[in-house]
């Protein structure tokens, strides 16, 4: 008699889609969830309408997993899809490392995620020393922590740098409150 096949352990992941529901790229949360279910992932949940997907998988090759998801997004939604893929546990560690005030009535707390560490290094280098009266930027493990004045998140020097085409395929930014919502599941 054959022994029963041992089920592999699944890991909770977070896919952060770059540029969704801005710049004319509109994807409904229900459609996004359906795609991830069709890809065979478990416990799929979308968070907010800004391209955040939580899912379980037993796939361990992060690069292959990221490529598979990006290709499926491109095919289904007909746009140049890029994601940052993280284990939820890793995201929790990144959020815990946020070095600035988490609640500040005058500033937004952001985390810049990257799929290519060299690009994050380059952003830090090109940003140079930022004016702390305007914004704050600090490198963390696999992320950049950024804080900028409310109402100016597209106008500061760091914001303009992050908006450059060069970084679109490898970085995406989330408000710290959004990151914390992604950790509650």
Segments and roles (model prediction):
Residues 2-50, 54-185:
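Surface-exposed, charge/polar-rich loops and edge strands
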């Amino acid at each position: 008699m054959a022994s029963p096949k041992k089920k592999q352990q699944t890991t909770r992941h977070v896919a952060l889609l770059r540029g969704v529901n801005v710049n004319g790229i509109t994807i409904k949360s229900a459609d996004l969830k359906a795609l991830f279910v069709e890809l065979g992932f478990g416990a799929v949940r979308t968070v907010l309408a800004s391209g955040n997907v939580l899912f379980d998988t037993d796939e361990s090759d992060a690069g292959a997993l990221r490529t598979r998801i990006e290709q499926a997004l491109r095919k289904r939604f007909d746009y140049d899809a890029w994601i940052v893929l993280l284990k939820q546990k890793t995201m929790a560690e990144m959020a815990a490392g946020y070095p600035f005030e988490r609640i500040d009535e005058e500033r937004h707390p952001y985390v810049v995620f990257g799929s290519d560490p060299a690009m994050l290094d380059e952003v830090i280098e090109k940003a140079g020393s930022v004016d702390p009266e305007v914004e704050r930027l600090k490198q963390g493990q696999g992320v950049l922590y950024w804080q900028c004045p409310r109402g100016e998140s597209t106008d500061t020097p760091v914001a303009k740098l992050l908006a450059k085409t060069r970084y679109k395929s490898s970085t995406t930014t989330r408000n710290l409150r959004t990151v914390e919502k992604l950790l509650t599941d």
